[in-house]
Structures are given as C-alpha cells and as structure tokens.
C-alpha cells in the first residue's frame, strides 16, 4: 500500500499539496522481514500500559531475537498471549502491563510449561 507522505503537520491553514515529500509504502516501513512477519489484532486489555489497546493491530517479527523486557507473542500451554517478557539466565516471566487492573498477574514460566517466545512485537497500529 502506498500513500502520500507529508513532511510536517502545520497548526494553521496548510496546503497539503505543497508539502508532499514522497510516496510512503507502509509495508516497506513496517515490515522488515516479509516471510517472518505477522499481524495480530489485540484481544484483551492486559497490555494497555504498554500501548496495546483492545482492537489494536500488532506487528510481530519472528526473525527478531527475543531480548529482556521485549514485548512478544508467546505460546504457553496451548495458548498465545502478548506480554512483556523478562528473560533470566534460566527463567522467563510474562508480565502484563495494566496497573489499573489487578486481575492480570505475572506468569512464571517453569520447565513444566510448554513455552516458546513466538515472535517480538515491532509495531502497534491504532485507530484514533
């Protein structure tokens, strides 16, 4: 998808036609590795303080190596979830980001869990 890309947003009475800088290809901007990038719609409110609201679209890249405190889609015991991942030397903990709702608790990953970090969140797309 390509759209006009405007350099600045003026607070007065601008002429948008004068400010067209180039064509913006959203896929080129948002997707670095096509074969390993996936789009998900957020279902739930456990990550609102991380900027992921219900209904947002997250872009997840499976080729990005997970790192401590990354936001990632994880598979744990038959379910997918998006959380902030605390990665220790021999441990992992999935952290919600919603301080206003005590329903969401950290998930301690143990050797008994069927667990993988499926992919790292690289972008969040919101409707305003």
Set out the residue ranges of the language-model regions.
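Short, charged beta-turn/beta-strand-edge "cap" motif at the junction between a beta-strand
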Residues: 63-66, 78-79
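C-terminal structural segments of small proteins and small subunits
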Residues: 101-102, 106-107, 116-119, 123
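Short, positionally conserved secondary-structure boundary motifs
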Residues: 1-48, 79-80, 87-93, 114-115, ...
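Short, well-ordered loop/turn sites that connect or cap secondary structure elements
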Residues: 52-53, 66
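Short beta-alpha junctions and helix-cap segments that line functional grooves
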Residues: 69-72, 106
């Amino acid at each position: 998808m390509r759209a006009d890309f405007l350099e600045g947003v003026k607070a007065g009475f601008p002429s948008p036609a004068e400010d067209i800088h180039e064509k913006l290809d959203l896929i080129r901007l948002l997707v670095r590795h096509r074969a390993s990038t996936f789009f998900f719609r957020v279902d739930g409110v456990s990550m609102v303080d991380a900027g992921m609201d219900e209904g947002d679209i997250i872009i997840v890249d499976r080729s990005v190596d997970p790192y401590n405190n990354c936001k990632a889609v994880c598979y744990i015991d038959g379910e997918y979830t998006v959380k902030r991942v605390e990665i220790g030397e021999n441990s992992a903990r999935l952290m919600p980001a919603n301080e206003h709702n005590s329903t969401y608790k950290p998930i301690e990953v143990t050797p008994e869990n069927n667990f993988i970090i499926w992919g790292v969140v690289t972008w969040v797309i919101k409707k305003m």
